[in-house]
Curated annotation (Swiss-Prot):
Keywords: Cell membrane, Membrane, Transmembrane, Transmembrane helix. The lineage of its organism: Bacteria, Bacillati, Cyanobacteriota, Cyanophyceae, Synechococcales. It is a multi-pass membrane protein. GO terms for cellular component: plasma membrane. It holds the Pfam family FUSC_2. Belongs to the YccS/YhfK family. It comes from Synechocystis sp. (strain ATCC 27184 / PCC 6803 / Kazusa). The chain crosses the membrane at residues 46-66, 70-90, 93-113, 118-138, 143-163, 411-431, 446-466, 482-502, 514-534. This is Uncharacterized protein slr1298. It is found in: Cell membrane. It comes from the Bacteria.
Amino acid sequence: MLAKLRQRLAFLTRTNGTIDWGRGIRTFCGMAVPYLGGMALGNPQLGLGVGLASQLILLADMGGLYSVRLKTIFGAWVGAAIAMAVGTIVPDGWGLGLAITGFVLFASGYLAVYGEQGAMVGIVTTFAFLLGAQNVSTDSFEFTSLAIGGMWSLILAIFIWPFRPNQPLRQMVANNYSILGNYLRAMAAANFSPDDPQAQQLVVKLRQNLLKSRQTLVASQRGLWGQSKLRELLLVLIEHTERLNKCLMLLNEIVNFHNLPQLQTVEILMEDAFNALGEVCLDLGQMVLGKRRIPNTNRLQLLVQALQQQKKLQRQALTEDFNDYNSLTTVTQLVNHLENLIKQLEQTIQTAELLQNPQLFSDNNSNDQGKLNKVRLMPWWDPLGSNFHLNSPLLRHGLRMALGGMVGATIAHLTQIPYGFWIVITLIFVLKPDFSLTFQRLSNRLLGTFLGVLVMSIALKLIQDPQLLSWLGILAIAMGMALLRFHYSVAVFFITAFALILKAIDPSVPTEYALLSRLVCTLIGSAIALGLAFSFLRQSENLRFTQASVRMLTNLEQYFQQLIPALLGKESINKKEAERVRNETRLAATAMQIALDRLLSDPSTPLEKQEPALTMTNYLARLSRGFRVLISHLENSSGSNPPPPIKLFTEQVQQSLENLRFSLEHQSSPAALPPMATTIKEIREYHQSYQAQRITEINQKQDFTPTRRYLDDFNLVVEECQQIYQRLETIHSAIARFTDSPQLANGIKLKSQPS
């Protein structure tokens, strides 16, 4: 029992990122400068109010393009001013005020349709609305603070825009190479194990970052400051990341195919090669950011020479054993792909060097620019309309926020608890669109608030000087903002300390009551959030994950159909259509990974369902990469006739994918896989007859024969077919375990999949 509880609450000790010292320093300056100005003018309270208003507005600054940040911060500023003005009318009529509160909180939650920026703008406006309702006064102190603070927040966020206009774009592209470099080093450290968790996380992160960088680059074309030539270079570098990743997939698959004893030296050399590639990619990331770091491929060249020597040794040791021939072809393929990879790296390095002087950039990459221009951004009103239905988790989130806000406001009104608006403030920061995220945020907030109240109950007895308390508060909020993405509990500890220090500076309520009120309001707000997230319009995480899995299998069926004509030797691959389906499959894989994270984080998920869900996610992504490897290899095929059993194999794969999808849709045990093992055996026997002929040809020093051409075309294909069969077996077993005790009654409908 205790072990299960520890597993459920393990997220409380887990960090989520790195400490953002830049944000902490910005927060400190944003609070300290107005406070010092207020002291100089004899009105430190106004200075503190301006600093607080600026930090409230800056909550909406989630990074990204300067233009997006400008729009987000300006929208939060205007929205906060309107919300604060509306908040002042709430006490005039309590019934009307309750209705207005519900409407404001619904709008706050529904703004999440615009992503993280929209969600934070909603939180800022709701916060301002609650402050307006709580601090109704005849003077204009709050509005003056908000007006000056909004302008100050814009200066803090984007003052560097004219000096480094393309820095967000550079950072986005540099992150691609940094993630790729870390992935390569992780693979080398894990001896190319496909099950290494760190490597798997980096693959998902790279896929997400590539998608985000493309979207960001598209958005940057809308008449923003900066040189368009530089954006063209950055687009080319994104394309190069894709090409490098494609080569690396092939290398990784080949290394995993042939785990032969006679290739131990080759494996050691490949580990060194992956480490060297990782260093080059990390240097490329620094180079994109404008730092003087020239990647060096000399070590890679030496490792390729060592592999070429191993190829000669394998050829000299060739006997009648098929494993010896497999060793030779493995080393040959590794050398060829490494050489292609080095050529691609050299082109990438040359492109990165042009970032120092974008005027030298020619129009040779107009095709890449065309890809960018074909992408269209949706109208701003489209997310509002497309999510306005009860199947949308974001609409349900808005309704939960509205109901929770009205319940919290009612409790605060009836109990007259001091600072009762903290109930609703807790709700807007804790309640998330899905239960698992709400539970994690709630637990972290309770822990941080409890520790903050405990420590401050002692500290406020020891420190009474208002000026010293002000500086301690500024330091506390700066630490809280810096730690917000690192660990939420620790950040809440400092934010709680800051809030209690503010109340101690202006003790309209005794400090002891403020401490108790903070804790009680947090508990009430958390209880409301937990109750709503668990029971009101809640979508099962099991259902969400199953829908994402069905979508992934549907895309894999379409993806496999793209390579069938080339696999059967009938026609070449339609690259444009294959790329389109591949992009849809990548999006489906990302959605499935997100659904998996939520499923694993949901405390109501049975532990026996977690392992098969994790296995399904990993192996469906691996199956997709296998299809991609086949397409990449078949694109360069010389047109040899395939093994006759390949046609039966393709039919069996199609049938397997269809059966697995049907099983998930109807939450039933999957039908048995077709007898692919027999088909694979027939393919191998046919293939080995060519290998035997080729061994004889090599001994007779015959090159460039039809036999060699066939083997060049189908060595990797046959091995990949074996891997596809094994992965389908694993997926079949995982789905059988996942559907063993179904919790869904009526099957899955894709049209209800969350957007």
